[in-house]
Amino acid sequence: IESHLIAALQNRADQPVIHAMRYAVSGGKRLRGFLVLEGARMLGLPDHRALSAAAAVEALHAYSLVHDDLPSMDNDDLRRGLPTVHVKWDEATAVLAGDALQTLAFELLTDPALGTGDTRIALVAGLAKASGAEGMVLGQALDIAAETAKTPLTLDQITRLQAGKTGALICFSAEVGAILAGADRAPLRRYAAALGLAFQIADDILDVTGDEAKTGKRLHKDAEAGTATFVSLLGLDGARARAAALVAEAEAALAGY
């Protein structure tokens, strides 16, 4: 995935926006790309059939992080232990780099190696839905609205928010293999929905218990802002128990494979 993204950004203009794009896609856990490749492997597809889709979801994810870090959004100055894009360059460059990474994601989905035209259209439609006003963007909008809400979010509201902001792209990533193979998406969708929520709960737990030097980002933001989280609503032990239950649910969804 790393080399595919590097290749996609070669032979581009020697401009700050291109340097910022390369900076933004470097590093990270590659969870979403991993889900794309593993889902395809599980359904018997070779890596080259899914590689451009894996790079696409990572480019899309990188765009979302660049924009989320902006002062008008989450106002973060540290990401993966390094200065965020708007800090290293400036806000305008960060906005443009994010925009360009988003369009790069859809450019990558035109790769003929992904399959027929219908398959690629399904991938484009799926990524657009997961990242737009029904998915990730909706989740971020709900998150911003919660900052000025008169009452803290309920558990159901936080679950809905995170299903969009974090979960939608994770779900799409897991479903890519089924789209490529023409297989049933439902088991992978159930798996990823549970995994995505467990991932977010783990992130909330790390915000309370983690080490900034290891996580590479500023911690305790939610507590300082008085933002409701899974930990603030369930308690630390309750959040851990909920995450463990979701992991078991995710594993059960894959029992048929």
Language-model regions, residue ranges each:
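Mg2+-dependent prenyl diphosphate-binding active-site environment of isoprenoid biosynthetic enzymes
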Residues: I6, Q10-E251
